[in-house]
Amino acid sequence: ELWHYSYPVSVKRNHGMSRTVPAVTDKFVVTIGPKLHVLCADALTGKPYWMIDLVKDYGATVPPWYAGQCPIIDGDRAIIAPGGSTLMIAVDCATGRVLWRTPNPKRWAMTHSSIVPVSMGSLKTYVYCASGGVVGVSATDGRMLWELPDWKVQIANIPTPVPVGQGRLFLSGGYNAGSMMVDVTSQGGAFSAREVYRLKPETFGSHQQTPMFYRGRIFGVIPDGRLVCMGLDGKHIWDSGTARFGLGPYVVADGKLYVLSDQGVLTIVDPNASKYTPLGQARILGGSDAWAPLAVAGGRMIARDLTKMVCIDLTGK
């Protein structure tokens, strides 16, 4: 252990407590705590720079099962979606000064989904699924560019929007939400968003994990536990048949699709094949709530369940 930092917060264990992934640069670490305390610390020493209480400062509502939103750092700014009085904020990482705020007149609440940067032509934007719909915000000044209230997920909206190119975004969720393809266009500086198609949950509906987009294909685990490979037209290319994976994470790295099951079994799949093609399999965890996102870097994978974290060598050396 190089350093640690903690602050007191009263919480009850409910499938664990830590659901958000810190944003890290060579200078800063930004975290969102279970009850919406945003902390920025020095990446080398752990020295805290600043903290923002989203509940106190913005009237944010703590989501069920506590915070699930992952902060992002874009350049020298932390981008956060509080909900309450303010839909989104940009914070200077060095000082904690709020650089811009996006008003939230409809009082859409924070969800477990996270913000994703999306370029719309030459304009950089941030897209976020709030409780009342999906929105696009200017990265320059926080101005609301478009909103689509047609997309709502009851109880818990968890997956992040997936940019698939040409102004389109793929949205997916659990609790019978299914999926939606959205097309965002602009004319004369005015943006608009429309539904291209909607899929029933049994066709494609990801409960917890954000679907993967790779080489024109969308990958995800649907409610019955099958891994599905789907084209941008919303039609299945293949599925995993009798193989089931549950609520665990998946990631594409080095041309392979890694899928972790609820039981802690890691399966390697060929994402380019015309049918479900597993390449290898190994149990790496005990499996209790093995739902946290997988992280891959330098030929290694970090995975965890409720009680254990492991680092796996993917190079075969």
Model regions and ranges:
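Short coil/turn segments that connect the beta-strands within blades of beta-propeller domains
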Residues: 26-27, 75-76, 122-124, 166-167, ...
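WD40 beta-propeller blade core
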Residues: 1, 39, 89, 135-136, ...
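Blade-level signature of beta-propeller repeat domains, shared across WD40, Kelch, NHL, RCC1
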Residues: 177-179, 264-265, 287-317
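Extracytoplasmic beta-rich repeat domains
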Residues: 4-23, 51-73, 83-85, 101-123, ...
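Short loop/turn segments immediately following beta-strands, especially the blade-tip
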Residues: 44, 179-191, 232, 268-275, ...
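Short loop/turn segments immediately following the C-termini of beta-strands
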Residues: 34, 83, 131, 174, ...
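Loop/turn-rich, solvent-exposed surfaces of beta-rich toroidal or solenoidal domains
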Residues: 177-179, 201-273
